[in-house]
Amino acid sequence: MGKAMIIGAGGVASVAVHKCCQNPEVFEEILIASRTKSKCDALKEKLDGGRTKIRTAAVDADDVPALTALIRDFQPDVVLNLALPYQDLHIMDACLAAGVHYVDTANYEPEDTAKFEYSWQWAYADRFREAGLTALLGSGFDPGVTGVFSAYAMKHEFDEINYIDILDCNGGDHGYPFATNFNPEINIREVSAKGSYWENGAWVETEPMEIKRVYDFAEVGQKDMYLLHHEELESLAKNIKGVRRIRFFMTFGESYLTHLRCLENVGMTSIEPIDFEGHKIIPLQVLKAVLPDPASLGPRTKGKTNIGCIFRGKKDGKDKNYYLYNVCDHEKCYAEVGSQAVAYTTGVPAMIGAMMVMTGKWRKPGVFNVEEFDPDPFMDALNVWGLPWQESHSPVLVD
């Protein structure tokens, strides 16, 4: 079918590369590019020899001319951005310059400000449209599959959706007193920020971890979950017509929250530079350096994740509730691709999103979120590539 360039070599990229190599009919050749080429080479060494040809390269994703030159040299059908969210705009610039479609899993966030929103990337819509290129935003699980679930529910189950609750439960145990399941810097910035939800056409802001609920998750059990701001709230509020409220909840254990509060209290989660022995350092980046690498958690992690969406709305004039979700087993993920389920649930949809664009099933000029395309081929692919979904027509609701 064609070629894909994957930028990044962390846990999510590792899963995506594994999945591309399982799908050689679509991904005939891939280029893995990262600032640290040795990580790319390690993936190539592990997976080389199959039907998917693998190349590697070193690149600084913030160096737009160098990145553009690399894209032009490889001539991929799509660039799959699995680097840091800070680098999204530079990679989009390079794709425009090289004339290549773009896919990512997380929206842009300025490095010096703990704030993420789609406005910066949506502003590229005219440029991608004029270039005849597709930019697919947020093709992970949340955002990503949660948007596809929403589009599927709207297409097949409802005449109108009024309420969406997105529930992200990680019931895994890695044995550490404190560690993050993906990039510590991004994770801690996300959970220490103020929460918010969309209601009646406006944002309602909350203090960090202010709103707590308890929910009994299938195959995981009862967990405490907390309302956070999450990026798909913004796109779903725009794209799911008639929605009155959208909320996002994520589960956290008491040990995690206790450690996080302690680190916040001593200033270790700050992104403001400080002077230390004549050098400028950012406390959060120092913390990231001493915490366990998320990529190392795979062999230690047991348990399951459960991520999904509870919908409330109308069908044929009657009230209706509907729940779509996926349960993923950490140990099974590690046995298959050498990564835990948090990376797996992001890396698989990343590959599927790239496949949707490469095959033309999802392709139109402009910048789009996943819920703006036909959900059916993506939903079918989830069942094929390791993230089978389940549904309930009588879910327990979140108050």
Where are these regions (language model features)?
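N-terminal Rossmann-fold NAD(P) dinucleotide-binding loop
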Residues: 13-14
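Rossmann-fold NAD(P)-binding glycine/threonine-rich loop
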Residues: 106-133
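C-terminal catalytic/substrate-binding lobe primarily of soluble NAD(P)-dependent oxidoreductases
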Residues: 155-399
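N-terminal Rossmann-like NAD(P) cofactor-binding module of classical short-chain dehydrogenase/reductase
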Residues: 71, 77-81, 95, 102-103
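Conserved Rossmann-fold cofactor-binding substructure of NAD(P)-dependent oxidoreductases
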Residues: 60-76, 83, 87
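Rossmann-fold cofactor-recognition segment
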Residues: 49-63
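Glycine-rich Rossmann-fold phosphate-binding loop(s) that bind the pyrophosphate
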Residues: 9-10
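Helix N-cap at the beta1-alpha1 junction of Rossmann-like dinucleotide-binding domains, i.e.
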Residues: 36-39
